[in-house]
Amino acid sequence: MQQSGAPCDFSSSDSWVILSPIEQSIKRKIEAVGTPLKDWDINIYRGVLTGYNEAFIISTEKRDEILANCADDAERTRTAELIRPILRGRDIKRYGYNWANLWLINTHNGIKGKLDRIHIEDYPAVKAHLDQYWDKISKRADKGETPYNLRNCAYLEDFSKPKLFYADITQNLNFVYSDEYMFCNNTTYFIASTHTEQLQYISHFLNSRLIDWYYRTLSVQLGANAVRMFSIYVLEIPIPHEHETDVYKAYGLNREEIAFIESN
């Protein structure tokens, strides 16, 4: 089959798009050199589902108010540790983020056999805040053992480890590395690994113009430019194991191919 002079091969069971000869050459080189992310020592997780963001995701002003309402320094210290920064998909930029001064009340449900759930009785000021939303939080489906607790999250501890945040829907592929103990909401995913240098290395490629182009040959595009960052496609992105900082050189692109990517 041909369309606009571009040959296509539909013999593969993979997702397909119509590519020109130069695009086919670039795609082949990327896939020949790189190892798909699914074969790296990483995991991909989605952000936190609270079931009722109005209660559990708060502004800095509200956080300060809750801390001011703590009975003593011990409660204030516990509460400050419980309330952690949270990112949304729209906050994430390439290699950085614009934090909206939002915080998650992390009244987690624990991890079976490993970590006890949060007991709200230990956080009176937080309880007073959540009680204002009792009618909503008590009826939500996404809750833990009590309405005060968030739903189960087996990868809870990974939020405190090195990770790459990225948005669920984005105009350009934007990944940001963070080793801070912070959360993201359900418009965001993150790549987790215990290997800090590996994550930073992967980030260099994922933020490149070349991989942005390549990803669009895998995923379905939304509108003119946006794409959904489905894990099934992200895990197929090939990253070279050889530590080469020049992305184009790492994949063996020639001048014509580089010029093509730069012009897109």
Regions flagged by a language model, labelled:
Residues 4-238, 249-251:
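Polybasic, glycine- and aromatic-enriched phosphate-binding surface used to engage nucleic acids
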